[in-house]
A protein has these predicted regions:
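C-terminal alpha-helical "lid" subdomain
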Residues: 172-190, 312-316, 326-434
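Gly/Ser/Thr-rich loops at beta-strand to alpha-helix junctions
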Residues: 62-67, 244-245, 377
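Eukaryote-specific, cytoplasm-facing alpha-helical/coiled-coil scaffolding segments in long proteins
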Residues: 68, 135-138, 246, 409-417
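Conserved phosphate/pyrophosphate-binding and hydrolysis machinery centered on Walker-type P-loop NTPases
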Residues: 31-35, 63, 99, 121, ...
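P-loop NTPase nucleotide-binding core
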Residues: 57-60, 64, 68-231, 393-397, ...
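A short, basic N-terminal segment
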Residues: 1-54, 398-434
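The catalytic "switch" region of P-loop NTPases
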Residues: 4, 8-9, 185-238, 242-354
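Amphipathic alpha-helical segments in well-structured domains
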Residues: 38, 70, 102-106, 255, ...
């Protein structure tokens, strides 16, 4: 590796991998394979930036690299001037609910709202201020009031659900901006983040009659996608991971309500009615294929998401909504370990702590311990390799051959939890006894 790597990027990548989590930055330093899949998502991003829409379900076994892939797509989208909202689903965050779980998902998306200049989240206020700053400049040039320009620019949002109130909230933020009223600005951001739980509180604070509730989160995302384009960005990409949590819902009605929301998003995307808005969803094969609990249990989704019957054997088709991630091969994993070695050395080949033969020997050692799992679900294997490099770095003169036999490699069994089903409300026959 000849590219010099900044210590900040090195530490970010290595600390994340050592802890068994996916790095939020620097993914390009350790990316291997998946060229066609990445090209497919980049084409989606370009289409969204051109005012179109996108919808992809990224499917892969536990440990196949879904989260890494989604984070890589997220980074590419921000480089292309898209705003990215990302969140993991869990029992308290869903696409559809009646107990606040959907609003909780929306609030998490807004907390994680990211741009190229603010990649770690919390970008909502900056986006609003960028829109207002542009409006103020135009208002000054035309000799008009800033609020009049804002109202004019947001006028076409009023055709959407909550559009009038959205415009009122942006205007309220502008007043707070001009008057130095921090409380008014904070209240406007609270509304935009979906943090008001009652309409009464929102009306008292901002004079608006609606709030972001469980039923309106998708409509609010459509509003936001148009707004970020008015603020000078290319569009909005919504990245949702851990959709297996919908598969794990025990209550059939709750599951189907969430799948119905996914169908609505998919239909809008296919019909082109969502402007500058894209969705990328990450899940396991069970979440997609299970005929009783997965997306395929919902007939309308099965017909839209089914695989091209001609894509068999080595033939692939990336034009459909589903992108299937295959597991890494031993060759891919070898390249990955080489890249990790390079990151550890800050890109300086003269500082590599193990030679290529050492990587081969490490892979053979892992294969003897846990078989194919060492490259198919490589989380624990990567952690062990980084631990080995850390010992070699901090103990100069130690031979890697002496340490190899003592390297502990365990199979990654975290995927077993994905098949467990929540006992929330119970299925129809959950307690049936003979």
């Amino acid at each position: 590796m000849t590219t010099t790597i900044r210590p900040k990027d090195r530490d970010s990548v290595l600390q994340s991998l050592r802890a068994g989590v996916v790095p939020r930055a620097g993914q390009h330093l350790i990316q291997v394979g998946r060229t066609r899949e990445i090209e497919t998502l980049v084409n989606d991003i370009d289409r969204i930036a051109d005012g179109g829409s996108g919808f992809r379900v990224v499917i892969g076994e536990y440990g196949a690299g879904k989260t890494f892939f989604l984070n890589l797509v997220r980074a590419v989208a921000m480089e292309r001037k898209l705003v990215v909202a990302s969140a993991d689903l869990n029992p308290d965050r869903r696409l559809h609910a009646s107990g606040g779980q959907a609003r909780s998902l929306y609030a998490e998306l807004m907390r994680n709202l990211s741009t190229r200049t603010k990649p770690e989240g919390g970008a909502l206020a900056g986006i609003v201020e960028k829109f207002i700053a542009t409006a103020k400049a135009d208002a000054k040039a035309q000799g008009l009031a800033t609020e009049a320009i804002i109202r004019e620019r947001l006028s076409h949002l009023t055709e959407l659900v909550n559009g009038y109130d959205f415009a009122d909230v942006i205007a309220a933020y502008c007043r707070g901006f001009e008057e130095g009223n921090e409380e008014l600005k904070a209240n406007a951001i609270r509304w935009l983040r979906g943090e008001y739980s009652t309409k009464t509180d929102a009306r008292q604070a901002l004079g608006v009659r609606s709030i972001v509730d469980d039923a309106s989160i998708y409509d609010q995302l459509k509003l936001l996608s148009r707004f970020v384009r008015l603020a000078g960005f290319s569009g909005l990409l919504v990245s949702l991971d851990e959709l297996v949590n919908l598969y794990k819902l025990a209550n059939t009605q709750a599951r189907n309500s969430n799948y119905e929301q996914i169908l609505r998003i998919l239909n809008d995307s296919l019909q082109g009615s969502a402007e500058g808005l894209g969705f990328v969803l990450g899940g396991t094969p069970e979440f997609l294929l299970d005929p009783r609990r997965g997306l395929y249990s919902y007939p309308a989704l099965q017909s839209r998401l089914s695989q091209n019957s001609f894509a068999t054997g080595e033939l692939v088709d990336f034009s459909g909504p589903v992108v299937r991630l295959s597991s890494l091969t031993p060759e891919d994993f070898y390249v990955l370990l080489q890249k990790i070695r390079g990151v550890f050395a800050l890109g300086d080949e003269s500082k590599h702590l193990v030679p290529d033969q050492g990587i081969f020997s490490f892979m053979e050692h892992c294969s003897k311990r846990i078989g194919d799992a060492y490259f198919r679900t490589p989380r624990t294997t990567i952690t062990s390799f980084i631990n080995l490099l850390a010992i070699l770095e901090q103990n100069p003169g130690t031979a890697w051959q002496e340490l190899l036999g003592g390297v502990e490699v365990l199979a990654d069994t975290g995927g077993n939890a994905d098949l467990a089903v929540d006992g929330e409300d119970g299925d129809e026959f959950a307690s049936f006894k003979m």
